[in-house]
A protein has these predicted regions:
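Positively charged n-region of N-terminal signal peptides that target proteins for export
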Residues: 1-4
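Bacterial N-terminal signal peptides
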Residues: 7-17
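Boundary at the C-terminal end of the N-terminal hydrophobic targeting segment
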Residues: 19-26
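Charge-enriched, low-complexity helical/IDR scaffolding segments
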Residues: 24, 48, 107
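Short N-proximal segments of mature Sec-exported proteins
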Residues: 32-83
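Compact alpha-helical subdomains of small soluble proteins
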Residues: 63-127
C-alpha cells in the first residue's frame, strides 16, 4: 500500500512538473513571439523613416506621399504583419485568426498613417 501511495505521489509530481514545463515553454514562446513582433515593428518604422526623409519627397502632395508609403518597405511590412500575427495567436489562442489578421493589418495601416501625418505637419509651407 505504501508503494502505491509513493507511486501515485510520483505520478502527480511528474504531471505537475510537465504541466509547469509546458506552461513555461508557452510563456517562452509568447515572449519570443513578442520580441519578434517588436523587432518587426521597429524594422518597419525605420524603413518608413528612410522613406520619409528622401529628398525626392519634397513637393509631393499628401496623397502622392501616402501612395508612396503604402507601397514602400514590402518585406519589412510583411515581416511585421506576420510576426504580430504570430504573437497575437500565441497570446490569445482562443480568438479567431481572422481577428488577429485584422489587428495586424490595422497596425500596419496605423504606422503608414502616422508617417503621412508627420510628412504633412513637417513639410515646408507652399510658396
Amino acid at each position: 500500500m505504501r508503494m502505491l501511495m509513493v507511486g501515485a505521489a510520483l505520478v502527480m509530481m511528474t504531471s505537475a512538473a510537465m504541466t509547469f514545463g509546458a506552461m513555461a515553454d508557452d510563456d517562452d514562446d509568447a515572449k519570443g513571439a513578442q520580441k519578434l513582433a517588436m523587432q518587426g515593428r521597429d524594422d518597419y518604422w525605420h524603413c518608413l523613416a528612410r522613406e520619409y526623409s528622401r529628398d525626392s519627397n519634397q513637393g509631393m502632395s499628401e496623397q502622392d506621399f501616402g501612395r508612396s508609403v503604402a507601397g514602400a518597405c514590402p518585406s519589412e511590412r510583411q515581416y511585421y504583419r506576420v510576426a504580430l500575427l504570430d504573437y497575437l495567436t500565441a497570446q490569445y489562442p482562443n480568438i479567431d485568426a481572422g481577428a488577429h489578421l485584422a489587428t495586424a493589418n490595422r497596425a500596419v495601416e496605423s504606422a503608414q498613417k502616422d508617417i503621412v501625418t508627420a510628412f504633412v505637419k513637417h513639410r515646408p509651407p507652399a510658396k
